[in-house]
Amino acid sequence: MDSFKIYTQSDIDLLISERVGEEKLGQHVHVYDCPTCPEGEIDIQALMDSPARYVLLGIPEDIGVRANLGIAGTKTAWNSALKALLNIQSNLFLSGEEILVLGHFEIEEPIDTSLQGLRKKVNTIDALVYPIIQKIVNAGKIPIVIGGGHNNAAPIIAGASLGSGGHKMNVVNIDAHADLRDRAEGRHSGNGFSTALGSGYLNQYKIFGLHQNYINQSLPDYIAANQNIKAFYFEDLLQSPKSVIENWNEFIADLQEPSGLEIDLDSIEKVLSSAQTSSGFQLNDIRNILLCNRRNFAYLHVCEGATEMADGKTDSTTGKTIAYLITDFIKALQPHISQKP
């Protein structure tokens, strides 16, 4: 049965590699605590009572990717990313006290693994994910979600919208692909944003770094006809005299609130993912964007990464890459070291 596993301190401790003279982030993060709540239930007040500002959770699944005829493997990113994050040094730059590690979704394989069966299962995943996101946002916290496929953008956007009083979300997606495929195909990782738009939860949608080689003939016309959808093509970035961060800041200048940030790891060169690319952003480009951010994003979703793919490819550094993105996102809105008492 599909469910959400809430982590205890014991779950966290099992992932920490202790070393004399060092303190790890995992020794300072918070876990969910509600002794009076029924087992497995997440209470909004209990989330509000936590001193942590950020709530970390995982969606280790690749059903949405497979439903889009992609290569399985994105379910492997969460554990690797979490272990990498928990073993970062706790210090004055980031202590770990800022983070509540909530847990991860446990999603069973569908009995019917046909394309239709997989797409039906994605609908089930949507219904499982959005209420948890809704509670986190309702509690005034910022969810950091590690996927999983980009199909999960739809329930994350829905949950964030409902949790913020029903306000439509405005989202910028760093991605080589638009994920605006036809909803009539059935749910999969290629139509997360068209689903969010069609469901009324998404207002502005901006794609940064979209690759011209991976869009169908009708997409440019579709974008041009919709004033709320904007794309900055990666090929235009390559020809621009401005830096990536300058183009980014100009591109998101009119992004309204509440807003969400999506990072598809297939936009970054040589990161193992469902659609790994040889041409894309450098990891430090994305780190620069995150560390220079001063916008209060309502959520961060990092998706499509993997440590092991069904075709046999492996990369043990993916978890560390994701951990960098998580910590950069948090550090950006912390007081600079020079401003701390």
Which role fits each region the language model picked out?
Residues 2-341:
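Conserved alpha-helical scaffold segments that buttress catalytic/binding sites
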